[in-house]
Amino acid sequence: MKFLDEAKVYIRSGDGGNGCVAFRREKYIEFGGPSGGNGGRGGDVVIEVADGLNTLIDYRYQQHFKAQKGTNGMGKDRHGANGKDIVLKVPRGTQIFDEDRETLLHDFTELGERFVLAEGGNGGFGNAHFKSSTNRAPRNANPGQEGEERWIWLRLKLIADAGLVGLPNAGKSTFLSKVSAAKPKIADYPFTTLHPQLGVVNVDGREFVLADIPGLIEGAHEGAGLGDRFLGHVERCRVLLHLIDATCEHAGKAYKTVRGELDAYAETLSDKVEIVALNKIDAVEPEELKKQRDRLKRAAKKTPLLMSGVTGQGVPEALRALVAVIGEAPVSDKAKAAADVEPWSPLTG
């Protein structure tokens, strides 16, 4: 399934039904009095977090969603039926923004969470409602209230326990495929990964969700390369695993490039726990490896882990370092569900 983390949609709640003007007409009852029923209430537009979703791709193919109108009132004091709500299914981690793309309306973090985004209009009163001691035969009724309409933005920030960051070709996808059942595209050219990938990792009987974020280059926060639009997905991660390619020209400069982009994107990423690892150590000579490790240690101001996603050397140590930060509690079913991609229509009801 294709990945989409942002979508613009139009929503409209249902109009209320009109009230009815009617009078009783029965045998032997000369003045039956008013009997017009009230109109039904319009349906609401509801956003709900669904299990098994991690993309907004369905909203690329359908952008307009309208709840059902309430039916009109009828004679014999019959009220109109309420309109059905329309429920839009979204993945956990979705944020709802107003049309200006800045005003946050709601942030969904729990499975099954529901939010009424637009309430249906109230039904109009029938003439029976206006009967009084001074007005025994009212001939007026109210129209139904109009529903609400608006354009909104859906923005997805995947919820994972740990995030993989680094320059393009740092070996992030290889690492993810090695430690989980995820099957990201792997090739020897930059920007092989074009959208985030999720995998469930099991280490020492404990599980956590790992997100592979497309590679960053210098100037990403200004739109270079794939830009920084995917960095929102690591904002919710508890820990970052920063992979540096040992075969690159200068490991210290590579680290500072990505670190600079993270800091430029959001201050919250500066506060994230970061584990630094020098990857692809199987592809360099011992002498060069020592130089790269020293360069990286000076730049990161911490001793980097040494590992190879291809041979598996150092991988268990990296995973245990992640688990130590994430905590000993096993990941919940809700988090694991975020790593499964299941087809789902956004529209129910």
UniProtKB/Swiss-Prot annotation:
Its main location: cytoplasm. GO terms for cellular component: cytoplasm. Residues 160-327 form the OBG-type G domain. It is an enzyme of class 3 (hydrolase). Pfam families: GTP1_OBG, MMR_HSR1. Signal peptide: none annotated. CDD domains: Obg. It comes from the Bacteria. GTP binds at residues 166-173, 191-195, 212-215, 279-282, 308-310. Keywords: Cytoplasm, GTP-binding, Hydrolase, Magnesium, Metal-binding, Nucleotide-binding. One of its GO terms (biological process) is ribosome biogenesis. Residues 1-159 form the Obg domain. It is found in: Cytoplasm. Mg(2+) binds at residues 173, 193. GO terms for molecular function: GTP binding; GTPase activity; magnesium ion binding. Its cofactor is Mg(2+). Its EC number is 3.6.5.-. Belongs to the TRAFAC class OBG-HflX-like GTPase superfamily. OBG GTPase family. An essential GTPase which binds GTP, GDP and possibly (p)ppGpp with moderate affinity, with high nucleotide exchange rates and a fairly low GTP hydrolysis rate. Plays a role in control of the cell cycle, stress response, ribosome biogenesis and in those bacteria that undergo differentiation, in morphogenesis control. Monomer. This is GTPase Obg. It comes from Rhodopseudomonas palustris (strain BisA53). The lineage of its organism: Bacteria, Pseudomonadati, Pseudomonadota, Alphaproteobacteria, Hyphomicrobiales.
